[in-house]
Amino acid sequence: MPYKIALIGTGGRSLSYAAAYQKRDDISITTLADPNASHRYTMAKRAGLTDDYAEYDDWRDMLREQTALDGAVICSPNHLHAEHAIGYLERGLPVALEKPLAPTKIACENIIDAERSNDGRTLIGFVMRSAPFYTKIQELITRGLIGRIVSIQADELPGVGVSSVMNRSPWRRYRDKSGGSILEKSSRNLDF
């Protein structure tokens, strides 16, 4: 029996999860939540979902009504991560979140508290950890092949792709919603 997964936030990032899950027999996207019906429709179509999935405008309705879920993948804007994650963690479900965990220290602490008090599990999507370029750098550092690291310069060179993401997702431009450019774009450099 496949794990039943809910997707909260059905914008562009969620499509990557859907594509990965389509290749697996042990995971099934059974529920979508997003206030944007067009996003839900696009996600369902691209994920190849049939009529046997549920969709919701409000994630709270989904949390209340969908009692057989095995986990939640949260692809909502950063400022909503804490609210979404805490709801699912308090129900005892594991959650996967896109980076960053949340845009503020207190929101991060609240997620961690919910995880600890409910014996929960949280995965943060730092996908660059497995990118060949970064794994090679990590290997060179770990093996000591480039000497002692005393300084790192990590330049984020935005191209057309980054510009289109910012235009498509205008919330990313506002620090109170995204956490600012260090959390939104450069957190992967800090993670490394």
Specify the residue positions occupied by each region the protein language model found:
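Acidic-histidine catalytic/liganding microenvironments
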Residues: 24, 47, 65-66, 131
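Rossmann-like NAD(P)(H) cofactor-binding subdomain of soluble oxidoreductases
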Residues: 80, 100, 123-130
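Predominantly a Rossmann-like dinucleotide-binding segment in NAD(P)-dependent oxidoreductases
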Residues: 128-192
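Beta-loop-alpha module in the N-terminal Rossmann-like domain of NAD(P)-dependent dehydrogenases
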Residues: 11, 17, 53-114
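Short, Asp-centered acidic motifs that coordinate Mg2+ and/or phosphate
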Residues: 31, 70-71, 151
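Rossmann-fold dehydrogenase core element
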Residues: 110-127, 148-152
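N-terminal Rossmann-like dinucleotide-binding module
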Residues: 1-50
